[in-house]
Amino acid sequence: MRRAAFALLAAAGAFALAPAAGAADLARGGQIYALHCATCHGPAGQGGIPGAPKFNRGERLMQSDFTLLATVRRGRNVMPAFGGVLRDREILDVIAYVRTLQR
């Protein structure tokens, strides 16, 4: 019961952090992407190293902002965690920017 309550509170808190539609700073997201993400995911999201998802296709980006935020915070497989490097707002800006890379 405690775990369920904690999960519900965590989800509610994350949604409170979610930006209003159109509130993302795409320019800042692009700058952060170029600095922290492009080496592995490619400058245009086309992929760079084996195991790094391609963002110029929509499969990975069909996930919610909340799910992608959690993945970037914690890291996954070969991707390091960025929770201690970037603020949630910055990660959300990167997510919004990456969504513009889809073909």
Q: Model regions: which residues?
A:
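Post-cleavage N-terminal segment of exported redox proteins
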Residues: 1-25, 71, 85, 98-103
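A broad, structure-centric signal for solvent-exposed, well-ordered loop/edge residues
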Residues: 8, 39, 47, 62, ...
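The canonical Cys-X-X-Cys-His
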Residues: 29-43, 94
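Short amphipathic alpha-helical/adjacent loop interface patches that line ligand
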Residues: 33, 37, 65, 76
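Axial heme c-ligation environment in periplasmic c-type cytochrome domains
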Residues: 49-56, 71-103
